[in-house]
Amino acid sequence: LQEGARAATGNIHFHGHLNVKGLERRLQKIRQNDMENAILVVTESLFSMHSDTPDIHALKAVCDEYNASLLVDCAHDFGAIGDDGLGHLGLQNALDCADIVIGSFSKTFASNGGFIAVRNRAQKEYLKYYSATQTFSNALSPVQAASVQAAFEIVASQEGRDRRRSLMDNI
């Protein structure tokens, strides 16, 4: 995520890991000088290095206060965690908190590629126009798409629930 952000812009601000108050201070400082430009707060739903997770509702509340959008990368837990496989967004009942959700098909779904889900129409249009070169150069093959679909059907089934429960019991 950090490398992608650096490739996109030099205007990046960091705050302490899982530190909602630190994020609030950072956004307050940014908004003191800039009330117009968009701010994108990026987090993972599950940080793989230490298996910790942010409070998505708290992040969303701070984002709303400072007119920022919240992007949640659920690559590490989507399909693998929670009774329904919705990861920490589901466990925290926070599916409606993220403005943008991104994820990977290379983990739970055993393929390559990924997805992006966008709530805001303006952000959707922005991505449509400014990501066109990526869209047409990295399309999933029909076999990869079928593999993802088959894996998703397992994730959403009773078999998927049983497998996730068994996995959690083994930890």
Regions found by a protein language model. Name each.
Residues 1, 24, 168-170:
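Conserved PLP-anchoring active-site segment centered on the Schiff-base-forming lysine
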Residues 14-18, 138:
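Short beta->alpha connector loops at strand-helix junctions that form conserved
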Residues 17-71:
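Active-site phosphate-binding strand-loop segment of PLP-dependent enzymes
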Residues 1, 49, 72, 77-79:
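Catalytic P-loop NTPase motifs of RecA-like helicase/translocase cores
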Residues 66-69, 76, 81-171:
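Active-site C-terminal subdomain of aminotransferase-like
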Residues 1-9:
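Substrate-binding/gating loop at the entrance of the active-site cleft, primarily
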Residues 11-14, 101:
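Conserved beta-strand scaffold positions in the cores of enzyme catalytic domains, especially
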